């Protein structure tokens, strides 16, 4: 048996903002029809539970101009109204709003105070019309899986390993080589000092014998 995800909505005179609250949605399918039928389905959770919802919106919509963005925590839709006017509610006037549909107060503005559009900077959108109603969209799960396909992040390890391959970094161990060289220089000078000391000792013995004689 399917479950209903929480759906939040807000509007401007020319558009409706619909947010489907469902984290880590997989195989997300969103469909929008000109007559105003909005349907959603996806799986989520460790058990792969099926979530579905179907809403008959208050009026007709412009599918071609409507957009959708699939995120990690939710699916955000900007639905363009076919006619720029305020809706009394999200669903048709002769229907009661389902219990899982709520007002999105973070995006809501009053009709007398038609504020600016919602800031969508940083969000990636696709057009409903250009995606065939988004029916074939693999959803966030597939998208994230595709990122896993980059596997290239594991490439960071290869890159780091490659730096080891530079050997030059190991060359920083060259500091030890410099130290070894200085040690060698010191050891080379020691025999010379010993010879000088021996010659000095012989000279002192000669002087002592001369004084004795």
Curated annotation (Swiss-Prot):
CDD domains: p23_hB-ind1_like. Residues 176-187 have a biased composition (Acidic residues). It comes from the Eukaryota. PROSITE patterns: CS. One of its GO terms (biological process) is chaperone-mediated protein complex assembly. It holds the Pfam family CS. Residues 188-213 have a biased composition (Basic and acidic residues). SUPFAM superfamilies: HSP20-like chaperones. Residues 168-213 are annotated as: Disordered. One of its GO terms (molecular function) is protein-folding chaperone binding. Disulfide bonds: none annotated. Residues 2-91 form the CS domain. Transmembrane segments: none annotated. GO terms for cellular component: cytosol; nucleus; protein folding chaperone complex. InterPro entries: CS_dom (IPR007052), HSP20-like_chaperone (IPR008978), p23-like (IPR045250). Belongs to the p23/wos2 family. This is Uncharacterized protein Os08g0359500. It comes from Oryza sativa subsp. japonica (Rice).
